[in-house]
């Protein structure tokens, strides 16, 4: 023992336990046997009949050596590895392949391999061994002299022969109904095949293979990796489930199958993906985090004298011992509670229960669990494990016989360990409560989990580390069971400076809310994390062993039932993200092909040597699942980064074109995507790949030209808006064209909001009929950087409509709010940036639901038979009708998608027929309505010159004619009334005449605002009066007898005028409209309620009592004019414009006419409406008046009741 030990329980190296007996083969523990004679079980002698240490060690050794040559190893490493592999699988002694078969057979028992299958497999394996030795020798010879042509020829020939031989041999190891006992053989053979296929990628080109041959071998490696992985997992699960039983003994066998085939099969399968040299082009560090359980520490001595004879049930043991999926953790302290069993002088102090504390990698707090019975102990032993790793346990299981039966217990344990920070310093702690006179049996963990090699001491060659200890409620039910993790899973999450580092996500220290740890599918080397909603998975810490300036890329192995955006945070700051595709369908099982890699190519650094790193997923639709196996950190060097960027750019460029025609652009490649690929190429290093960059740039330019050629939009790059009325974009005021920025490479547009939804912001263009093909689907698509309430329409037979609100992205630059720029202030698109949401799609197709809030959008429209005479074309409209609305969009395209077939063809034919039927019906209706409307309009004027109104034409008649005109349906598109529709020409013709009538009528009426459409403007008011809406009319309401309304009007002396008033009187009294000059020449129109009798109260006054000497106080010059000045002032207001829609708002309204395209109240507000007739009770009175001066007064009043005035007109008589 070491003199420097800290206490009496700590020693250097393993403790030796003296043997006390050699009679372990048989045990007689019956109550009537003499205890001192019968309880003789040799210490140091393992008699577990299920264990085959040599078989397990072979699997452990091979997996351990493979972990050292993952990725692209050094040539010397590879030669040494193949020498080791051939020596392990084809040694000079007994055939390991046969041992593999026997080992599984012994565990499963009920399923044996037939002699013929066994003999065929062994013979074929022997042949493979010879082929491998031959290949290994040729490989070593060629590696010694790679330029030797003969060596190169020999190795190539032997490689091809061996690869073909093993490809055809593997089916012999998966014979039907014998897959389970052959599983270890199958896994080892599959491993050999995949390693061999890797060599083609490593050396094939040097051996003289063509790039096509090398690529073929690579594709076979990928295909067989999936096939072999799924086979191994499937038959492992099948074999395990077959062993599920009801007793403790069946659980022991079940657990051994789980443990031994994890070591010999699943551990290999977990490493298969890392053989991919294109994914792992440099040495790679992988980690196995799965747990395996050694057998319970109870005496096993035949069917009658073993602990499991009276142990707990299968399910009780499974529930008590096997932990639920959890984050990776390790022990920090063990407290053991001891109880005593005694029969006479025979004493067994046994492990009755324990408390363990454990921690996670850089976790801030510890957790603890309690097992067994911890009350009333005779002693308590505390064993610290802080910064120590236990690599071996030697346990002493005891049996104490009595008249009531045998009591089993664990009476001693030696923990061999190393210091985590000083692995060459070996230490040990032990639990030894004492015993006397009992039978004992040694349980050495090395028997079940042997070291990777016997050529080194155990403290250097160990394969596993103790991670947990569990047991049943009592030691009789289930003795303590040790749980172990593979030594490859470090306990610091250290990132290597010269390797790709794989870190399973279960090695995080804290789960985020919404994340669960689920059992691994068998091929991941451990458990995995799962989320059903967006958010971070877990919080991890990593440690660097090198300079902080080293840059990295992150890669995540994931599975998902939905497209999603995966992000990475470093040191708490979210700075990197990427959009990735779904890998599986909802409800499907997790298989090897369910997993894919999400690579975030942006390079980053760590701010500190110990930094946090978090993987998360942005919000995705409910009902979906996302699983993450691990993240990987890949070193970025200047050369590696340039090569990686070049490869990525090459793939991106190649992906633009179809596989059948390398000069044909894929339909689903958007114009925006081409721009982004061009950015990718332009950012390639001139120093490392100038020639390749030039070649790729020419291909991208060609793709851009193809994109321009197929785009049917005029001026897609927004050189102008409303610049040419016959082509290109037409838009409202306020739209701005912006030059390229960090998001768009070319021009884009900004659409602002509007304060009135009846005057929306709009941008539109028509695709001419001549550009379209019959029975073809077309697609409008583009890129929206940011929008709110953006409405998009495609209109032909009917309207395709979608409203998109796309939240603007956060700053794409790591330094938030600062956009990198070039020397001249241009956007620096090569600066490191976040890869933010570039591939979300919003595709609104027939029968499908559109995904909103996506930067990419697309709408489809189907075109039936084209007709150049009708020239329907397709209207493309962008519109915003809310104050908060806005949009920033570009890279717009309208392209031919595909010809219509099947149901789509039938659907468009039905839509076309329905539209044509409606059109024909509308033509017949329009012909009739137009004739009636034209007659009404013509009746307003004296002749067809439309420059002089009939003498009896009043405002009501004009409104009536306007009503007839507005019966013409579909003059403009209801979606955007600035766009003319089918009947625009005839509507604008007649409406122009109506405007002229209004203009002439207003010029003839000297009184301003005589219809009160502008409230009380131009009227002088005394007392309380009001202008109200009555039946869609503006009417003047006087309800107090002292109220007065007047207007001074300038007239022409010696000319005749007609005063015409339309009004309604309620209640008693009179309503009066008086016209007079300054002192005399007064006349009045009187309105009474003719329903009432002509009897008035004594206090009732009449209009004759009104003073005629009213002052003009309050009149404004703006409301005074001669009739010709009034005409001049309104000339522009009513000037017809045949090229623009109507903007006039008439006074009287009626319900909107029925439009087949739907009601649009804004169309009504702009004059596209009917007008109500005068309500019952209104009468029109008039008188002739001949002024003698240039000014007259119009006064309105009443004596009592309510007087309602609809209009007041003073019309100049014709000469």
From Swiss-Prot:
Domain of life of the source: Bacteria
Coiled coil segments of this chain: none
Keywords: Sporulation, Toxin, Virulence
InterPro entries reported for this sequence: Cry1Ac-like_dom-VII (IPR048645), Cry_V (IPR041587), Galactose-bd-like_sf (IPR008979), Pest_crys (IPR038979), Pest_crys_Cry1Aa_dom-IV (IPR054544), Pest_crys_dom-III (IPR005638), Pest_crys_dom_I (IPR005639), Pest_crys_N_sf (IPR036716)
Disulfides per UniProt: none
Sample GO molecular function, one term: toxin activity
GO biological process, one term: sporulation resulting in formation of a cellular spore
Gene3D superfamilies: Galactose-binding domain-like, Pesticidal crystal protein, central domain, Pesticidal crystal protein, N-terminal domain
Role noted for this protein: Promotes colloidosmotic lysis by binding to the midgut epithelial cells of insects. Selectively toxic to Artogeia rapae but not active on Plutella xylostella.
Family affiliation: Belongs to the delta endotoxin family.
Miscellaneous field: Toxic segment of the protein is located in the N-terminus.
Identification of the protein by name: Pesticidal crystal protein Cry1Ka
Organism of derivation: Bacillus thuringiensis subsp. morrisoni
């Amino acid at each position: 023992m070491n003199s420097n030990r800290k206490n009496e329980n700590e020693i250097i190296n393993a403790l030796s336990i003296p043997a006390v007996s050699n009679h372990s083969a048989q045990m007689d523990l019956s109550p009537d046997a003499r205890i001192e004679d019968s309880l003789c079980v040799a210490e140091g002698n393992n008699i577990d009949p299920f264990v085959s240490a040599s078989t397990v060690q072979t699997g452990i050794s091979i997996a351990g050596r493979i972990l050292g040559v993952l990725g692209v190893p050094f040539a010397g490493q590879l030669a040494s590895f193949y020498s080791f592999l051939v020596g392990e699988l084809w040694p000079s002694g007994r055939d390991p392949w046969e041992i593999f078969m026997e080992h599984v057979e012994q565990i499963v028992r009920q399923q044996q391999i037939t002699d013929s299958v066994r003999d065929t497999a062994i013979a074929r394996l022997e042949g493979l061994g010879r082929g491998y030795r031959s290949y290994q020798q040729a490989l070593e010879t060629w590696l010694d002299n790679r330029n030797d042509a003969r060596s190169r020829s020999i190795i190539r020939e032997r490689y091809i022969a061996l690869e073909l031989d093993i490809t055809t041999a593997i089916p012999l190891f998966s014979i039907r109904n014998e897959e389970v006992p052959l599983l270890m053989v199958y896994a080892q053979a599959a491993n050999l095949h995949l390693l061999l296929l890797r060599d083609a990628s490593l050396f094939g080109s040097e051996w003289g293979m063509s790039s096509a041959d090398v690529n073929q071998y690579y594709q076979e490696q990928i295909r067989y990796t999936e096939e072999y992985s799924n086979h191994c997992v499937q038959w492992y699960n099948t074999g395990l489930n077959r062993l599920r039983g009801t007793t403790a003994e069946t659980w022991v066998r079940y657990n051994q199958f789980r443990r031994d085939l994890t070591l010999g099969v699943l551990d290999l399968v977990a490493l298969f993906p890392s053989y991919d040299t294109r994914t792992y082009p440099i040495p790679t560090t992988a980690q196995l985090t799965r747990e395996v359980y050694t057998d319970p520490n109870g005496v096993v001595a035949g069917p009658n004298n073993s602990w499991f004879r009276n142990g707990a049930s299968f399910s009780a043991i499974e529930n008590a011992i096997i932990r639920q999926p959890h984050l990776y953790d390790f022990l920090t302290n063990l407290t053991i509670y001891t109880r005593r069993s005694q029969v006479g002088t025979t004493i067994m102090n046994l492990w009755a229960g324990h408390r363990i504390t454990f921690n996670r990698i850089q976790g801030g707090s510890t957790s603890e669990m309690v097992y067994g019975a911890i009350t009333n102990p005779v002693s308590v032993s505390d064993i610290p494990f802080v910064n120590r790793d236990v690599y071996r346990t030697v346990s002493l299981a005891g049996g104490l016989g009595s008249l009531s039966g045998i009591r089993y217990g664990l009476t001693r344990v030696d923990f061999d360990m190393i210091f985590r920070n000083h692995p060459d310093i070996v230490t040990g702690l032990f639990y030894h409560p004492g015993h006397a006179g009992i039978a004992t049996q040694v349980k050495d963990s090395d028997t079940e989990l042997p070291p990777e090699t016997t050529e080194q001491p155990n403290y250097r060659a160990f394969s596993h580390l103790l991670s947990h200890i569990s047991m049943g409620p009592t030691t009789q039910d289930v003795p303590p069971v040790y749980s172990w993790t593979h030594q490859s899973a470090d306990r610091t999450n250290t990132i290597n400076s010269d390797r790709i580092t794989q870190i399973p996500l279960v090695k995080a220290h804290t789960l985020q809310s919404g994340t669960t740890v689920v059992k691994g599918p068998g091929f991941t080397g451990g458990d995995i994390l799962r989320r059903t909603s967006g958010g971070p998975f877990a919080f991890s810490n990593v440690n660097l062993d090198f300079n902080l300036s080293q840059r990295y890329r992150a890669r995540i192995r994931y599975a998902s039932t939905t497209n999603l955006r995966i992000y990475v945070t470093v040191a708490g700051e979210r700075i990197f993200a990427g959009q990735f595709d779904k890998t599986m369908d909802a409800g499907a099982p997790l298989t090897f092909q369910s997993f894919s890699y999400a690579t975030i190519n942006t390079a980053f650094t760590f701010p500190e040597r110990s930094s946090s790193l978090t993987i998360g997923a942005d919000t995705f639709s409910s009902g979906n699942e996302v699983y993450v196996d691990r993240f990987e950190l890949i070193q970025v060097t200047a050369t590696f980064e340039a090569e990686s960027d070049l490869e990525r750019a090459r793939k991106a460029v190649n992906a633009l074109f179809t596989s059948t025609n390398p000069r044909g652009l894929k339909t689903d490649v958007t114009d925006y995507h081409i721009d982004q690929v061009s950015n990718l190429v332009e950012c390639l290093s001139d120093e490392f790949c100038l020639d390749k960059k030039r070649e790729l740039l020419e291909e991208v330019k060609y793709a851009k030209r193809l994109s321009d050629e197929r785009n049917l939009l005029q001026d897609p790059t927004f050189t102008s808006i409303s610049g040419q009325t016959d082509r290109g974009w037409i838009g409202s005021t306020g739209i701005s064209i912006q030059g390229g920025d960090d998001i768009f490479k070319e021009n884009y547009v900004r659409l602002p909001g509007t304060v009135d939804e009846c005057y929306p912001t709009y941008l539109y263009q028509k695709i001419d009929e001549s550009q379209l093909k019959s029975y073809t689907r077309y697609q409008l698509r583009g890129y929206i950087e940011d929008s709110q309430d953006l409405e998009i329409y495609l209109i032909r037979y009917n309207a395709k409509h979608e409203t998109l609100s796309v939240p603007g992205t956060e700053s794409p630059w790591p330094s938030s709010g600062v956009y990198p720029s070039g020397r001249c202030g241009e956007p620096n698109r090569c600066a490191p940036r976040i890869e933010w949401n570039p591939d979300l799609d919003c595709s609104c197709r027939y029968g499908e639901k559109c995904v909103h809030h996506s930067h990419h959008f697309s709408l489809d429209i189907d075109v039936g038979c084209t007709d150049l005479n009708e020239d329907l074309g397709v209207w493309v409209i962008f519109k915003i009708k809310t104050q908060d609305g806005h949009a920033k969009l570009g890279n717009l395209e309208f392209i031919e998608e595909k010809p219509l077939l099947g149901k789509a063809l039938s659907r468009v034919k039905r839509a076309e027929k329905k539209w044509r039927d409606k059109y024909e019906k509308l033509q017949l209706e329009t012909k009739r309505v137009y004739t009636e409307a034209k007659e009404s309009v013509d009746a307003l004027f004296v002749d067809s010159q439309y420059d002089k109104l009939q003498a009896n034409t009043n405002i009501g008649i004009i409104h009536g004619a306007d009503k007839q005109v507005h019966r013409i349906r579909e003059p403009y598109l209801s979606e955007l009334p600035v766009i003319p529709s089918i009947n625009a020409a005839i509507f604008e013709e007649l409406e122009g005449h109506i405007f002229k009538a209004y203009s002439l009528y207003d010029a003839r009426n000297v009184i301003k605002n005589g219809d009160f459409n502008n409230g009380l403007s131009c009227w002088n008011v005394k007392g309380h009066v009001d202008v109200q809406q009555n039946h869609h009319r503006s009417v003047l309401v006087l309800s107090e007898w002292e109220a007065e309304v007047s207007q001074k009007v300038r007239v022409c002396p010696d000319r005749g005028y007609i005063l015409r008033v339309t009004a309604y009187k309620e209640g008693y009294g009179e309503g009066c409209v008086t016209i007079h000059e300054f002192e005399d020449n007064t006349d009045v129109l009187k309105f009474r309620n003719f329903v009432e009798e002509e009897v008035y109260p004594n206090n009732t006054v009449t209009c004759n009592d009104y003073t005629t000497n009213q002052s003009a106080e309050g009149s404004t010059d703006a409301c005074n004019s001669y009739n010709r000045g009034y005409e001049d002032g309104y000339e522009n207001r009513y000037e017809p414009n045949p090229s623009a829609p109507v903007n006039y708002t008439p006074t009287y309204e009626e319900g909107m006419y029925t439009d087949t395209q739907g009601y649009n109240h804004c169309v009504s507000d702009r004059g596209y409406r009917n007008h109500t007739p005068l309500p019952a009770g209104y009468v029109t009175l008039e008188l002739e008046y001949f002024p003698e001066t240039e000014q007259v007064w119009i006064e309105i009043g009443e004596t009592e009741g309510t007087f309602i005035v609809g209009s007041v007109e003073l019309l100049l008589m014709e000469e």
